[in-house]
Amino acid sequence: SQQTCCGALFQHRGELHHAATLAQQNKVVFEKLKLDSIISTASGCGVQLLESGVGNDNCPVIDINQFLVTAEGWKGVKIASLPQTILVHDPCSLRNVLAGHEYAYQLISLIPDAQVIPLAGNDQCCGAAGTYFIEQSGVANILREGKVSAVMSNESLYLVTSNVGCALYMADGLYEKGVSIEVMHPVTLLARQMGLQL
């Protein structure tokens, strides 16, 4: 068998048996590989892998921002300048559970001339919250409106976030308001400045 979905969305919907089945499949696969760590590219998935017991002390779950920032060899890497303001959204999962939101800032700060600014209201949820934006759309839209307003009060061309659900939900809200801003993962923006296509 192979690596599969982390099961977070099933967990959020209350489908605990399905989420546990996926977690067990991942645990078996990862244990066979004898990994040093599990790198997660989406903070919500990282939390699910951690809390479902897939990651452990011998094989911790590490967010990709942290993994890259703590990697050696950055001095020789050519990164194109980007003299722009880059807003950083802190996903609740990264800030409150994985406790690693500062790594996204450090990663984006590797881009020369970038002005890295936290999105106002980062201590509050954007409203996506797994499946919350589907199940409680009214409240979720109110939460998102605060994020959209914070983006609109800046003249930034870039908003980075480490959670795919947050990215999609905020991008949709910004699109509805006619705001022209790219919403992407911090790694995607850094890769672009390195001349890589993800």
What are these regions (language model features)?
Residues S1-L198:
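Iron-sulfur cluster-binding electron-transfer modules in prokaryotic oxidoreductases
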